[in-house]
Amino acid sequence: KSFIGDEPFAVLLGDDIVDAEVPCLKQMIDAYDEYKTSILGVQEVANENVDKYGILDVKHIEDRVYKVKDMVEKPSVEDAPSNIAILGRYIITPEIFNILETQEAGKGGEIQLTDALQTLATKEAIYAYNFEGRRYDVGDKLGFLEATVDFALKRPELRDEFEAFIKEKAACIER
């Protein structure tokens, strides 16, 4: 709080990596510059995965932008208002600090950012931006492996040898 002062700030969760032509944070900063309020980075997830994320109830505004009406932390499939998930990227106004100071523990006995954002939404408009790019959940073992392979294959100095390694391993897999 003392470092940020009275400025909006970005929160990037370390278990989410986004590969995009225009960096995800740049996309969100552009949205912030237009709307001048908190922006949540979102993408659609499969309905069966809504219980892994903060899920939004939204009103579509334009193109990739939604106005947030409500949010639910890790709802059941039946209770999810949509399949639009908050995916580890936020630009938040400093008002959130006043809310966090008095925020009660939520799911898992922890202070949940989603709960604090719900309170913030009663004080100011919050928008969601459906960012472009491939998101990897590197907190998940398979997501970590997918990111490692995809990023290695993009590196010119690794690509040929790594591709040969993958082909060798794939040939060993019995079907």
Residue ranges, per PLM feature:
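Alpha-helix boundary/capping detector
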Residues: D19, K26, T122, G143-A147, ...
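Terminal low-complexity segments of carbohydrate-biosynthetic enzymes
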Residues: D160-R175
